[in-house]
Amino acid sequence: MSPAGEHGTAAPIEILPVAGLPEFRPGDDLGAAVAKAAPWLRDGDVVVVTSKAVSKCEGRLVPAPADPEERDRLRRKLVDEEAVRVLARKGRTLITENRHGLVQAAAGVDGSNVGRDELALLPLDPDASAAALRARLRELLGVEVAVLVTDTMGRAWRNGQTDAAVGAAGLAVLHGYSGAVDQHGNELLVTEVAIADEIAAAADLVKGKLTAMPVAVVRGLSVTDDGSTARQLLRPGTEDLFWLGTAEAIELGRRQAQLLRRSVRRFSAEPVPAELVREAVAEALTAPAPHHTRPVRFVWLQTPAVRTRLLDAMKDKWRADLAGDGRPAESIERRVARGQILYDAPEVVIPMLVPDGAHSYPDAARTDAEHTMFTVAVGAAVQALLVGLAVRGLGSCWIGSTIFAADLVRTELGLPADWEPLGAIAIGYAAEPAGPRGPADPGDLLIRK
C-alpha cells in the first residue's frame, strides 16, 4: 500500500530523554518544568510523560503508614475505592477496571517511585491531563506537540509489562487499515494499530524505571490530530473476549447455570449434535437417587416415524378425553395445539421412572412414600438434564403430556409395564436465544422455622 496510508514512517525516528526534571510534588507546574528542561521541543514532537509525574503534580498522593503490612492494607483499600469491578484474582494480585475503563493490576494504585510514606493514584482524568500539558507547552514554547500520559501494564498471554497510553492529546491514537491492500494484493480487513501504545512503549526505553526520567520525546513521526483520546483505546468489558479472569469466568458460569434454563417453545431448524444430548444425559444421571439406584431412563425418540406415531396416538387420546369432559371443539383444538412443540422440536426425550431397587412395604403409606421418593429423584434428573442442555447452548421445554397417557406411551414404545413416563422434553436451539433469567425473590416461599 502507499506510504501515505502507513501509521509509521520509513525515516529514522529519535527517542530523547528529558533530563534535569525535579522530583515533582503536589501543585508543581509540570508544563513549566518540561518547558525549562526541554526548550528544544519542536512542532510535531510527541511528549511522553509517566502518569506518576502527572499524579504527583495533581496531588493524587495518599499518605501511607511506614509499616509494610499497614501500607499494604491501605493499598488494598484504595484499590477497592478506585476499581469499579474486579476481573481476576491471582494470589494477592487483583486485575481491575477503574472508572475510566482502564484494566490493569490494582486499579493503578502504586507504591513505586514515591516516598515510602505515600501511595500514588492515577490522574483523575488522564486525557484532560494530556490536553492541559499540551496547552501549557504551546503557551510557554509556542510549539504544537502531542502529549501521551503513560502507565505500565501487563499483557494477556505474554510475560512482562510494557508502557501504554492512558491519556492522549494531539495525535490519532489508532490507525485503521481496514480496506487497504498490501503489496501482495491482500485486503487488510481488521488491522488497527494502537499508535499511542506503540509510542508509549518506545519512549519507555529511555525513561526506564530506576533513572528518575519521567518524560521522553519521540521525534520524527508524522502525527495527525484527529481529536481522539486514549479513551478510544479502551474496549468495553462486555465486548472483550477475555473480560473476566479464568477463575471468575468459571465462577460466573456456575452461578448462571441454573438461570440459563428457560422453557423454550420455538426452535430453529439447526440440527442438534447427538454428542451434546449424550453429554447432558450423562450429567443428569448423577442426580441424587434413593438406595444407590438408577430410577430414571431417558427414552430418546430418534426415529421420526416412531415419534409421529406416538404423538398422533396421544393427540387422539387427548381429544377423546377433552370431548368426554364436555368441552367445545374449539377449546379442544386449542388445548391439543399446545402439543405441536413435540412435533416441531429437533429432538424429543421422554424421562421414565423405573422402580428397579425400590423397597417393598406391606402397607400403602410406605409404598406410596417410596414411590414419591423415586418420583422426586426422576424430577431431579430431569432438572439436571435441562440445565445440562442449557449450559451447552441448547434450549428445552419440559411438557407433562405423557403422564396423562402412560399406558399408551408404554404400548407405542414397547416399554415394560412398570416404567412410568414423567413428561416429555423438547430439545433444540432456541429460535430467539435469550440470556440467563434473574433469580426469583423467595419471599414467603422460603419458610423459616
Curated annotation (Swiss-Prot):
Q: Which residues bind GTP?
A: 21-24, 51, 56, 113
Under CDD domains, the record lists: FbiB_C-like
Pathway assigned in UniProt: Cofactor biosynthesis; coenzyme F420 biosynthesis
Q: Specify which residues bind a divalent metal cation 2 according to the UniProt entry for this protein.
A: 152
**Region Dehydro-coenzyme F420-0 reductase: start and end of each range?**
246-449
Q: Which InterPro entries match?
A: F420-0_g-glutamyl_ligase, F420-0_gamma-glut_ligase-dom, F420_FbiB_C, FbiB, Nitroreductase, Nitroreductase-like
User: Key word Transmembrane helix present in the record?
Assistant: no
Q: Which Pfam families match?
A: F420_ligase (PF01996), Nitroreductase (PF00881)
Q: Where is this region: Coenzyme F420:L-glutamate ligase?
A: 1-245
Provide the catalytic activity annotation.
Answer: oxidized coenzyme F420-0 + GTP + L-glutamate = oxidized coenzyme F420-1 + GDP + phosphate + H(+); oxidized coenzyme F420-1 + GTP + L-glutamate = oxidized coenzyme F420-2 + GDP + phosphate + H(+); oxidized coenzyme F420-(gamma-L-Glu)(n) + GTP + L-glutamate = oxidized coenzyme F420-(gamma-L-Glu)(n+1) + GDP + phosphate + H(+); oxidized coenzyme F420-0 + FMN + H(+) = dehydro coenzyme F420-0 + FMNH2
Q: Which residues bind FMN?
A: 261-265, 289, 400, 437
UniProt-annotated binding residues for coenzyme F420-(gamma-Glu)n: 321
Q: Does the keyword Secreted apply?
A: no
Example GO molecular function: coenzyme F420-0:L-glutamate ligase activity
Primary role: Bifunctional enzyme that catalyzes the GTP-dependent successive addition of multiple gamma-linked L-glutamates to the L-lactyl phosphodiester of 7,8-didemethyl-8-hydroxy-5-deazariboflavin (F420-0) to form polyglutamated F420 derivatives, and the FMNH2-dependent reduction of dehydro-F420-0 to form F420-0.
What family is this protein classified in?
In the N-terminal section; belongs to the CofE family.
Kindly provide the name given to this protein in its UniProt entry: Bifunctional F420 biosynthesis protein FbiB
